[in-house]
Amino acid sequence: MAALRDTYNDPVHIAVIGGTGLRELPHFTQVASLNITTPWGPPSSPITILHHTCSTSGKVVPVAFLSRHGLHHEYAPHEVPARANIAALRSIGVRSIVAFSAVGSLQEAIKPRDFVVPDQVIDRTKGVRPWTFFEGGAVAHVGFADPFDEQMAKVVRACGHSLEGDGVVLHDRGTLICMEGPQFSTRAESNLYRSWGGSIINMSCIPEAKLAREAEIAYQMICMSTDYDCWHSEAADVTVDMVMANMKMNSVNARNFIGAVLDELTKDEHAALVQAKHLEGTCKFGLSTSPGYLSAEALTKLSWLFPGYFSNN
């Protein structure tokens, strides 16, 4: 196999962030591998540029793929360089992200190997992870009432037909608990989250979703249930082996689902969504720091992320 290019000149509007069990997308043509350094450091993996041929139109569309936990799963949840990941993707043109995550189920109806398209998040991280691009002399407040992009969610939900297997269900909505980790929940915590109305639990959504919103990127997570966490009286408590076994058994479904979503997103009717036209300017107009008072460091970093957005003039 020829070496991949280390540059790619065309804008790439769509990205997939792979998590546990989804570290690559087979049947896509790899054309480039980009090593990008951002003001927040390097991302967790090189960004692979894939050419995706839409099954309906035959159109070839570039898609960026980034491995959240690194090529060899070397980043713990609290160590993932989320700011660098989101910044690097935006720098190559990405304006829409489909993120994948294994999750524990907090509800009987969400069985292992079911899929969930969450619409809400409860943040149970502990402030260890940097969660904003605005600091050190720049303050902005961006809305996060609906943490996922509803337009993206509609596209994802419409692709549930790609799922196969007896009893595999796509749940259209759900509240995702994002915990700190890397240890799994205590039984008391698991039951507490259930009492709050939590549907599923992971360690990856925050700050990824918050940073995507600040970066004006349409973001939707696709979750695959692998276990019942530790609340279920008749099911074994979650272990890494359990998670990976269910991921392996359902890997074809996961990849087919992602492929179906990419097929749909590459249609011309979704061009405005893919470029997140509905989010343009939300960050710029969320800035609270008075003009002329951005610190030099903050201005340098923000100008890298948003060329032409901010100035001290």
Curated annotation (Swiss-Prot):
Belongs to the PNP/MTAP phosphorylase family. MTAP subfamily. InterPro entries: MTAP (IPR010044), Nucleoside_phosphorylase_d (IPR000845), Nucleoside_phosphorylase_sf (IPR035994), Purine_phosphorylase-2_CS (IPR018099). One of its GO terms (biological process) is L-methionine salvage from methylthioadenosine. Catalyzes the reversible phosphorylation of S-methyl-5'-thioadenosine (MTA) to adenine and 5-methylthioribose-1-phosphate. Involved in the breakdown of MTA, a major by-product of polyamine biosynthesis. Responsible for the first step in the methionine salvage pathway after MTA has been generated from S-adenosylmethionine. Has broad substrate specificity with 6-aminopurine nucleosides as preferred substrates. Its main location: cytoplasm. The keyword Cell membrane does not apply. It is found in: Cytoplasm; Nucleus. Keywords: Cytoplasm, Glycosyltransferase, Nucleus, Purine salvage, Transferase. Its EC number is 2.4.2.28. Pfam families: PNP_UDP_1. Substrate binds at M203, D227, Y228, D229. One of its GO terms (molecular function) is S-methyl-5-thioadenosine phosphorylase activity. The keyword Transferase applies. It is an enzyme of class 2 (transferase). Phosphate binds at T20, R68, H69, S101, A102, S204. It comes from the Eukaryota. Homotrimer. It catalyses: S-methyl-5'-thioadenosine + phosphate = 5-(methylsulfanyl)-alpha-D-ribose 1-phosphate + adenine. Pathway: Amino-acid biosynthesis; L-methionine biosynthesis via salvage pathway; S-methyl-5-thio-alpha-D-ribose 1-phosphate from S-methyl-5'-thioadenosine (phosphorylase route): step 1/1. One of its GO terms (cellular component) is cytosol. The record marks S185, V240 as: Important for substrate specificity. This is S-methyl-5'-thioadenosine phosphorylase.
